[in-house]
Amino acid sequence: MGLNGNGAHARAGRRKVEKVVIRFAGDSGDGMQLTGDRFTSEAALLGNDLATQPNYPAEIRAPQGTLPGVSSFQIQIADYDILTAGDRPDVLVAMNPAALKANLSDLPRGAMVIANSDEFTRRNLAKVGYASNPLETGELSDYIVHSVPMTTLTLGAVESIGATKKDGERAKNMFALGLLSWMYGRPVTTSEAFVREKFARKPEIAEANVLALRAGWNYGETTEAFATTYEVAPAKLEPGEYRQISGNTALAYGLVAAGQLAGTQVVLGSYPITPASDILHELSKYKNFNVLTFQAEDEIAGIGAALGASYGGALGVTSTSGPGVSLKSEFIGLAVMTELPLIVVDVQRGGPSTGLPTKTEQADLLQAMFGRNGESPVAVLAARSPSDCFEVAVEAARIALTYRTPVLLLSDGAIANGSEPWRIPDMGAWADIDPDFTAAGADFAPYARDPQTLARQFAVPGTSGLEHRIGGLEKANGSGDISYHGANHDLMVRLRQAKIDGIAIPDLEVDDPGGDAELLMLGWGSSFGPIGEACRRARRRGVKVAHAQLRYLNPLPANLAEVLRRYPQVVLPEMNLGQLALLLRGKYLVDVQPVTKVAGMAFRADEMEEIIDAALDGTLADRERDKASFARSAAATMGAGQTVSAGQGR
């Protein structure tokens, strides 16, 4: 079989599989994210459906060989439509003992472990608490274990070009990529081209990585250790042109598209923050699409610039994560008072404070809804997947420009860094967005309103004859003059709320194939994939379960009350302590059952399946109470220096 993935293996047997879940794991400096990304690109070229889940520490260079320093990248590829990156890995590539120990509990019996045996030294084993080498003791007997001296083989491969030992060792991730590419029939020619382009200014580094990549492929082809290769056929996707895309990239593309649909400049004022920084980086490439990016000195300056751009007639955008939203809250309030369009992208992460910068969470919902002084309503939307970020960004722009309001667009770390195939849309079929600027010579009052949308009139500064001032003090309805009159303030508060309540949004769609489910699984944001996959599995077992996913969180869909009352049980899993459940219970007086998780990782589909079963057998409420009681009892019984081990408190 050639390096382009064509042909048949002369020695290894070929086995067809519908799907596979692979996890690459090693030190944060071992290149696991790049390795996973390249394997993802190879799978995309073959037409597989795929989903990815990166997981890495917050430190730029975490302590080598330690459990906190482990970086991993999980990908599921399949020959059918999938919704998640998979529950548990079928294959674990462990570059050192820490990677093995950190991920071993996630492996199902019979999974394959491919370990870089060169790194299983006495010192590295001791760092993570191994008294002996698990590759040799038999304690991995539940798994198919391949000990591969990746470092030694890589150094041997690059010896011919005189590469240094340091450069050779850095290329061992390419050896792992080559081996896995051989095993699953992935073409590596595109990865070779990528490496040569990436290191074009350092051809010796490029050559070392290419040689390592080929060495991994050739090792699989020639060794007797791997008796089987695997084939995952292309998925039957809707006709169209596809590309692999991450959530942050899709969101950036959506903002560019929105600017084109509205005929306005997009101005991003932003301060780099994990996990939202890629939006700033990506948008900076599109000056030719009338996009201006401004990397500010802090979060407050970023949103100030964005709001100023909106006042000047552009579409102002700022991107951040939870800590940044806290800092931006006063300017968001100013945008509410001045009734200017503004998009605030919040890529949520673990909190509070600095929290868990590289881990995912959904705990900013109440902050997005209410995190400002006074009655300060804003529209709130949530993306449900990486590719969905494109549509949600365009929709956020439509609402912001049409209704003259700030829009909080919620993503999270799992969506932002995850990737999946995205069918490139035909933008000619999308409706234009009308900013509806007041033209010179028209009747104008800054706070005169459209009777349908309640949006105020807006004249771009400098428009002849329409000079005006706005600011943070309360305005008189119509004229926009400063007003301290109580009755006017009451009117303006209610008008601003009515404007948000009246935003035109579609009804909530419910996936209930038989129309007779007893249980509704309700979600928002990145829970879409795990809930959807769990419902598919449950239905195959004969369980009647419905699924609905909220995109619009403020305002909520008009039919939501009817949907909630239609089902005897409504369960709402969230990566917080029940924030949306709290809102829905209060607004609709429906017994929405919250299911909470704040472990820094997204729900898995198998967890959701357990939640469905627990809801139907009546044990779900007890499970949730157990989580709270475990936290209190753990605090009372754990001594100094102790920590919660993996799996406790779930």
What are these model-predicted stretches?
Residues V20-D27, A176-G178, V266-G269, G316-S319, ...:
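Short glycine-rich or small-residue beta-strand-to-loop segments that form or flank ligand, phosphate
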Residues K19-P108, Y253, A258, V266-V267, ...:
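Thiamine diphosphate
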Residues G2-A262:
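Active-site cofactor/cluster-binding pocket
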Residues P57-R61, F120-R123, L153, I300-G302, ...:
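Short gly/pro/ser/thr-enriched loop/turn and capping motifs at secondary-structure boundaries
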